[in-house]
Amino acid sequence: MDIKAILANLEAKHPGEHEYLQAVTEVLHSIEEVYNQHPEFEKARIIERMVEPDRIFTFRVTWVDDKGEVQTNLGYRVQFNGAIGPYKGGLRFHKAVNPSMLKFLGFEQTFKNALTTLPMGGGKGGSDFDPVGKSDAEIMRFCQAFMLELWNNIGPDTDVPAGDVGVGGREIGYLFGMYTKLAREYNVGVLTGKGATWGGSILRPEATGFGALYFTEHVLKTAGKELKGCTVALSGFGNVAWGAALKATELGAKVVAISGPDGVCEIPAGITKEMIDYMLEMRASNRNKVEDMATKYPELAKFTPGKKAWSVKCDIALPCAFQNELNGDDAKELIANGTWCCCEVSNMGCTPEAIETFQKSGILFAPGKAVNAGGVSVSGLEMTQNAMHISWSGAEVDEKLHYIMESIHSACVKYGKKADGTIDYVKGANIAGFMKVAQAMLEQGIV
């Protein structure tokens, strides 16, 4: 495999798409050795086909705000790879959304979904619509307008969107309601992340954070350590960070920091159950300010503007917000403060420089495509329940989530174990996901 030639070709065709090219570069370097052991992959041009999406839908979304003024946004759906199942991946509503971001997310989703053991291809979508400061009515009208353009390209056996940044249970409800109106059928399998009373799965809101902590437990256990008693700093205060904080606390860790775009809240005594519950209120307010936590609980939390969670002394760092949120300087600051483990809960939450710094320093590090796979895993379980017209209990879903995260960890260890006995989780996750997708593509012919 000529990595330089492949990347040069991609850069020429997709100039300026930095996130997408970053994601592809990481995977290619991880799989180069194993890829070169399979000449049949080279003959079928598996890599050249795998790094390009099957198709991308781009559309205008026109809606009316509360002042009666017409607004327009761009909407996208990237159907990246469907070799092992229907396209599956979230919808992101954020002002920074662009094709590069969604292609990177769709590419990562392909490998993540392959790791879950479930039959799901990779996809991603969203819009540059900014929900911050919007009323509930405006969000509803936007979701309806978005689905008006998307509905004919999705379906339970074609492409199954879900939530992501800016898209939670409320938005999924509005999207599903409009889909039902347009399609004139009640097909619960077309979206996941639905309410538990109308086709959703119990534990889906918590799944990404819960799964991340289950995976982190396996990472620590393999290294001869345990989570109980550890201090944890995490970024964000949305659905993912909420689930991570909740499960970390349940498992005996102490969450000492959460952060937002405005700064960091340090919580020396550890976050409480009431504070964790308040995280959901903060996100629902659309204010996007973590300072609200310190305002609500001034005796427990101290807010520092302009700082990141990585400035707070901790044992374990959990990036839970956005791509490239933890850079090389942040990694050095964490190491200087005694951090010995970082597990990405956000997609590509660490820059290449940060990952290199962690790995060279012997810090335990695991990538998002493995760590945060619990969310899409329970989405896959929701698809199964919808197809069978049944509903599993929370205990049943949690048991299956435990099994999936353990299986993902085992796959990472299988392909990432080094001669000295340590685990390269980045390499392990990339190879495990790649081998499954590549074999499926090979067996299905040149299509």
Would you name each region that the model predicts?
Residues 2-23, 219, 333-447:
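Adenosine-phosphate binding glycine-rich loop
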Residues 18-21, 37-44, 117, 154-163, ...:
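Flexible, glycine/charged-enriched surface loops at secondary-structure junctions
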Residues 40-71:
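Structured beta-strand/loop patches that form or line metal/cofactor-binding pockets in enzymes
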Residues 59-120, 124, 128:
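Phosphate-interaction motifs
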Residues 94, 113-228:
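Glycine/serine-rich phosphate-binding loop and adjoining beta1-alpha1 elements at the start
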Residues 192-195, 200-313:
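Glycine-rich phosphate/diphosphate-binding loop of Rossmann-like nucleotide-binding domains
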Residues 263-365, 370:
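Rossmann-like adenosine-cofactor binding region
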